[in-house]
């Protein structure tokens, strides 16, 4: 029985670590010059690690409140042209700049802002 409790505790720790890891990877992708590079156009005023002078696109603030339906934000990052044909935002998913998994990790990070 002690072994079962220890296994349960490890499972909880692993789950918490996985969530933290997804946010961390999402932050790295959003800050990366060769992948997401969100900071090329967006500022992230509440992220002290996001150093940018960008003001081309809306700031990355209150993202969970602005996009309460995760799928809407995913589809916008995947290919914003589907919503706004005149957008200057790159179609990250449809042009294979980011994978579906990477976009989900970026959203995990954005939802902390």
Please give the residue ranges for each predicted region.
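Bacterial N-terminal signal peptides
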Residues: 1-9
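Electrostatic cytochrome c docking/interface patches
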Residues: 11-33
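Flexible gly/pro/ser-rich segments immediately N-terminal to CXXCH heme-c attachment motifs
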Residues: 29-33, 62-64, 95-98
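C-type cytochrome heme c attachment motif
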Residues: 31-44, 74, 78, 88-90, ...
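Gly/Gly-Pro-rich "capping" loops immediately C-terminal to redox-active cysteine motifs
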Residues: 40-78, 94
């Amino acid at each position: 029985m002690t072994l079962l409790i220890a296994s349960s505790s490890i499972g909880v720790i692993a789950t918490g670590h996985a969530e933290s890891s997804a946010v961390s990877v999402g932050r790295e992708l959003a800050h990366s010059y060769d992948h997401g590079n969100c900071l090329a156009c967006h500022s992230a005023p509440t992220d002290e690690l996001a150093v940018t002078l960008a003001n081309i696109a809306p700031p990355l603030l209150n993202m969970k409140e602005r996009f309460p339906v995760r799928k809407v934000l995913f589809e916008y990052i995947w290919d914003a042209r589907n919503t706004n044909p005149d957008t200057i935002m790159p179609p990250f998913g449809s042009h294979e700049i980011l994978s579906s998994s990477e976009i989900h990790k970026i959203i995990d990070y954005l939802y902390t802002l």
